[in-house]
Regions:
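Short glycine- and hydrophobic/aromatic-rich loop-to-beta-strand nucleating segment
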Residues: 18-22, 215-217
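Extracytoplasmic/periplasmic solute-binding protein
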Residues: 2-13, 18, 42-102, 143-145
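Short helix-initiation/N-cap motifs at beta->coil->alpha
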Residues: 38-44, 127-142, 175
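Glycine-centered hinge/linker elements that transmit conformational signals in sensory
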Residues: 45-47, 89-130, 172-178, 189-199
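Extracytoplasmic/periplasmic substrate-recognition and gating elements
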Residues: 6, 29-30, 122, 161-220
Length: 220
């Protein structure tokens, strides 16, 4: 929030939203489109996993995700789970019930996010649970992974990689056509009432992982 009582105190420099990165050449080679939902993500992963992406003769991975405990894995799980939980914008809340303060984790939406998060490991490196952000960045830039959840940092880093330069694209994080209905406490198909912000029936909930950065000048 840049303003308090209508007065500007800081200027936003970095939103720190997670983005979805993918290898354009790999998806094209296997006739795949960038996934818009997590269901589509798994179809793409199944089609491309275990193929050689960087020409070294070794099988590579459809996905790299940072999941190391006591590191930054919580950013990944919330980026995955958010579209199942929050359907009506930021006023609804994704971490807590905004009216009661109750954590929003014991519900079908977060459970579905955990299921997806776990299943992603079927298409990643064997040691994925011990990988943090620097590990997955390195693997992606070496051409070992075709899909990646990351901040904007990867974009300029990829420009310096002889392996992936000009061979990658980005989009918003995958969403879902099925979401948690808080009234019925079930996963249900999106409709205009349940998912008013959905695009073509797909609910997205972009996650500002790490919050962001802003700048200010001390008046003293």
């Amino acid at each position: 929030n840049q303003k308090v009582n209508g007065k500007t105190y800081t200027l936003t420099l970095d939103g720190d939203f997670h983005m979805f990165y993918y290898r354009t050449d790999v998806l094209n080679r296997f006739s795949q489109e960038p996934p818009k939902t997590w269901d589509e993500w798994f179809k793409v992963a199944e089609a491309i996993h275990g193929k050689d992406y960087n020409g070294d003769g070794e099988p590579d991975y459809a996905s790299c995700a940072f999941k190391r405990r006591a590191a930054q894995s919580y950013f990944t799980i919330w980026s995955v789970a958010a579209p199942f939980i929050q359907t009506k914008g930021t006023s609804q809340g994704v971490f807590f019930n905004v009216d009661t303060g109750k954590p929003l984790i014991n519900n079908p939406g977060f459970a579905e996010g955990l299921r997806v998060y776990k299943k992603m490991g079927d298409y990643g490196p064997p040691d994925e649970l011990n990988m943090d952000i620097a590990d997955v960045r390195s693997m992606y830039l070496k051409g070992r992974c075709a899909m990646l959840i990351e901040w904007g940092d990867t974009s300029p880093l990829a420009l310096d990689s002889d392996v992936v330069r000009n061979l990658w694209g980005t989009s918003q994080m995958p969403g879902s056509t099925r979401v948690w209905n808080r009234d019925t406490n079930r996963l249900e198909n999106c409709n205009p009432t349940l998912c008013p912000h959905a695009i073509n029936g797909i609910n997205h909930a972009p996650f500002g992982a790490f919050g962001g950065w802003s700048g200010y000048i001390n008046k003293n």
